[in-house]
Each structure stands twice: as structure tokens, then as C-alpha cells.
Design a protein with these regions (language model features):
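Early extracytoplasmic/domain-onset interaction patches
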Residues: 1-27
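Exposed beta-sheet edge/beta-hairpin loop segments within beta-rich domains
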Residues: 79-85
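Secretory-pathway-linked proteins and extracytosolic
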Residues: 98-214
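Carboxylate/His-rich catalytic cores and anion/metal-binding grooves
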Residues: 18-52, 184-190, 194-214
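Cysteine-centered nucleophilic/redox motifs
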Residues: 8, 89-91, 124
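Solvent-exposed beta-strand/loop surfaces of large extracellular or lumenal domains
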Residues: 30-78, 103-110, 136-158
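Short solvent-exposed strand-capping/beta-turn motif centered on an Asx-Ser/Thr pair
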Residues: 11-15, 31-32, 129-131
Length: 214
């Protein structure tokens, strides 16, 4: 199985950040093969008051990208509506997406680092069994990860400080290849990864016909 755990702290300094950019968090997952666990979600206001995210602020919807794609209508997007927001408040969110064995053939990570706002501290760790090959790289950056092995587990950790924001324009993006990103994979080779991608495009004609009728 695989677990992706995300922990974030985000302090609001502008009305744009509070009302447009960071008032909600979005988590996409496939409930047929994945489980979402919210460990913590709250807002620490400027005076130190804690406002826990109420149950009705966790809203499950269909991802907008899947709206006109019946084959993907089983996907879910958890919208976490952060409450108690004000200038100077800090949002705390800690969650895991746990994938059952057999759904993902290998670990395959591609995480963009830069956001529209500056990041004081960014940490990403990847842990795999010690005997599992792991290929990794920081794209468009020079930071060197720390590699540790303990208890039969190998962990690779990147820690970046004071990451500058990316420009808000379409020409600057992960697909364009001009932002910092961390990639990591346990595929033995690129050829093995391509085989998995190729299988996704192979389908039974009958299945396609039935899907088209929906």
C-alpha cells in the first residue's frame, strides 16, 4: 500500500489570500481504492483562539474535470472549507490519502514546489523498503536531499527554505518544465513505466461501446 501524508501551515496576510486563494483546500481521491483520513483541520486566529473545522465544512463533490467523463464519475473531491479566517490567522491541515495494495503498480511522484505565495519552509520525504530501487531528482533546483536508512526503510528528504513564488501566468507551470519540482519513482526503468501507461490505452471494444451509451 501507499500513503501520501500532507501537513500544511499557511498564514494569511492579504484579503486576496483569505478570500480567493486559500479559503478552501481540495483533495481528489478514488474511494474505490483509496481512503481519505483527516488527522487535523483548524484555524489559529491572530489572538491564539483555535477554530476547529466543523463537520459541515467538509464537502464531498465530483471533481470538475470529471463532470463530463462517465468513466471517472467514481472519483471524489473533498473540499475543506477553512473557517474562522482573518488577516494574521494560520490555517492548519493534516491529512492522508491511503491507497490499497494493487491499485498503483509502483510509487510515482511528481510534486511542484513553487506556489503563488512564498513558502518559508518546504519539506518532502519519500520512504520505501530498503531493497526497493528509488530514482529521484529535484528539477530546476540545486538542493541535495538527505538519505537515511533505518529499520529496513530508506527515506529521502528534501528541505527547502524561503521558496520564492512563481509568476501567475500560464507560461510558468509544471508541464512547461520551468518551475521547481521533485520527482521520485520505484519503476525499474522508463520502459517499465511506459508499459503501464500503454496498458491504460488498451481497452475492450465492447467496454468502450457500453461506456459511450451512458
Amino acid at each position: 500500500s501507499q500513503e501520501m501524508r500532507v501537513q500544511k501551515e499557511l498564514t494569511l496576510f492579504t484579503h486576496t489570500a483569505m478570500n480567493r486563494l486559500y479559503g478552501e483546500s481540495f483533495i481528489v481521491y478514488n474511494p474505490e481504492f483509496q481512503e481519505l483520513k483527516i488527522h487535523e483541520s483548524y484555524t489559529r486566529q491572530k489572538d491564539g483562539n483555535i477554530v476547529k473545522t466543523p463537520e459541515n465544512a467538509f464537502v464531498e463533490v465530483l471533481p470538475s474535470a470529471a463532470a463530463d467523463a462517465p468513466a471517472y464519475n467514481g472519483l471524489k473531491e473533498m473540499v475543506v472549507v477553512h473557517t474562522g479566517l482573518e488577516l494574521g490567522a494560520t490555517i492548519y491541515l493534516d491529512y492522508s490519502v491511503i491507497t490499497r495494495p494493487g491499485y498503483l503498480p509502483e510509487l510515482d511522484v511528481c510534486e511542484q514546489i513553487e506556489e503563488l505565495s512564498p513558502i518559508r519552509e518546504y519539506v518532502l520525504s519519500v520512504s520505501v523498503p530498503e531493497n526497493k530501487p528509488l530514482h529521484y531528482e529535484l528539477l530546476n533546483g540545486k538542493a541535495v536531499p538527505v538519505v537515511k536508512t533505518a529499520g529496513g526503510v530508506k527515506t529521502v528528504t528534501w528541505a527547502l527554505k524561503n521558496v520564492q513564488p512563481r509568476p501567475s501566468m500560464l507560461a510558468v507551470s509544471l508541464p512547461a518544465g520551468n518551475v521547481q519540482a521533485i520527482v521520485a519513482s520505484t519503476y525499474a526503468s522508463k520502459a517499465d513505466a511506459l508499459k503501464v501507461i500503454k496498458r491504460q490505452f488498451e481497452s475492450n471494444d465492447k467496454e468502450v461501446s457500453e461506456l459511450a451509451k451512458r
